[in-house]
């Protein structure tokens, strides 16, 4: 399932 929060850089 998709994670919540900003995409990791």
Swiss-Prot record:
GO molecular function: rRNA binding; tRNA binding
Keyword field contains NADP: no
Keywords: Ribonucleoprotein, Ribosomal protein, RNA-binding, rRNA-binding, tRNA-binding
GO CC entries: ribonucleoprotein complex; ribosome
UniProt family annotation: Belongs to the universal ribosomal protein uS7 family.
Role according to the record: One of the primary rRNA binding proteins, it binds directly to 16S rRNA where it nucleates assembly of the head domain of the 30S subunit. Is located at the subunit interface close to the decoding center, probably blocks exit of the E-site tRNA.
Subunit structure: Part of the 30S ribosomal subunit. Contacts proteins S9 and S11.
Protein name: Small ribosomal subunit protein uS7
Species name: Mycobacterium intracellulare
Gene name of the encoded protein: rpsG
